Amino acid sequence: MKPRNFEIFKKRLEEAGMINLAYDFMMASGKWSALLYRADIEMNLRTPEWGGFQLLDLQDYPGQGSAYVGILDAFMESKGLIAPEEWRHFCSEVVPLFCTEKFCWTNDEALTGEVEIANYSESDLNSKQLSWTLTDSKQQVLDKGVLPLQVKQGELAKVGTLKPAIASVRKAEKVTLALSIDGTPYRNDYSLWIYPAADKEGAPSEDICVTDDLDAHLKYLTEGGKVLWFPSKDKHKDQTVGGLFQTDYWNYRMFRTICENLDRPVSPGTLGILTDPGHPALADFPTEFHTNWQWFPIIKQSYPMILDRLSDDYRPIVQVIDNVERNHKLGLLFEFKVGNGKLLVCMSDLKAVQDKPEARQFYRSILEYMESSAFAPSYSLSAKDLQDLFTAKVKTGEMKKLFNISSYK
């Protein structure tokens, strides 16, 4: 008995020149998947008179074209994506919940949210209190407090409103709101992102050209200029894939077949991002190596570029993970040296989401990088190679249909 499907997937990734990224792809897509499972579970727990949920699936399923969507592998063993005790923070008989309108705030706003307790244990939670703390990335306490609890068994109870102070956060910061019921193992925590309100409209310095028409500024670039290019989505449909915030579910081939048979739009089929949090382009945009909620407007407006023509050792600053059927090298943010100039390419329409503080901060972080000495692309492309990358037909392998017993009509 051998995992023949894994052998096929490995060969495909080797042929795509990305086998060295296999573990990173698994961890980045898997950790993001765990956060998505958490969001779905908490959505259920926030629902009054909720009757339970069935999780499809806690473990990988090797059938139906291979559905490696589990937090555990096919043998019910950990894949290293999330610790069991962390999973129980949001999937337990008692779960503290923080209900808020958004995860990203500016420091001049009043961060507000409701605390609720889902109590499906065997007894009431009386004469107890919930402690909360808001800490920054260095574990410094920004604010804290307590709420009294009187929660009946089987009840979803609103226990109070939180308005943690965030005005003291002066730079872009990921903060953590921790909730815990004193004298019990029940706790939960939430990542929030705080951005400075000042300079809401990030502006480039005079030597940076920001454009959606590179042809008009190609001479400036090749002669030594710095260009931030937002390629037109409509002009490069054959060289890009759609933006997908959540991971593609089950497997791409099966649901692509279903959608095509029903004449419905096919999912972009991607699995989140992989990036280096320490890259200087992200110095003022706190992130993990995988997708999290602060990326939402950026990815929703994205159209990742297919970079298969580039050498195997080329890595985008922000790479989008493709599915095992296609294995494209996809870029959301990437850079080149072109002639004597420096080019940074962003495959997201940030103008469309400048009302979102996280999108403004991402743009600001990019500009700060381009203004610094750290902006020194090492991968050289000629103007002709750059044009081919954005206009030439992309080679794609044959993908056979995968029919399901249900027609889904």
Ranges and model annotations:
Residues W193-D213, P377-S378:
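Low-complexity, Pro/Ser/Thr- and charge-rich linker/hinge segments at domain boundaries
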Residues D108-Q150, A157-A165, A172-D182:
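Beta-strand-rich binding/interaction modules
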Residues M1-L134, Y314-P316:
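Substrate-binding clefts and catalytic carboxylate motifs of secreted carbohydrate-active enzymes
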Residues A359-E371:
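Short amphipathic C-terminal alpha-helix that caps PH/PH-like domains
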Residues P148-V151, P185-E201:
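Short beta-strand elements
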Residues K233-K237, M254-P357, A374-K409:
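Catalytic beta-strand/loop cores that center a nucleophilic Ser/Cys/Thr
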Residues S205-R253, P265, N340-C346, I366:
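Short alpha-beta junction capping motif
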Residues D60-A67, V141, K235-D238, A352-V353:
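Flexible loop/turn segments at secondary-structure boundaries
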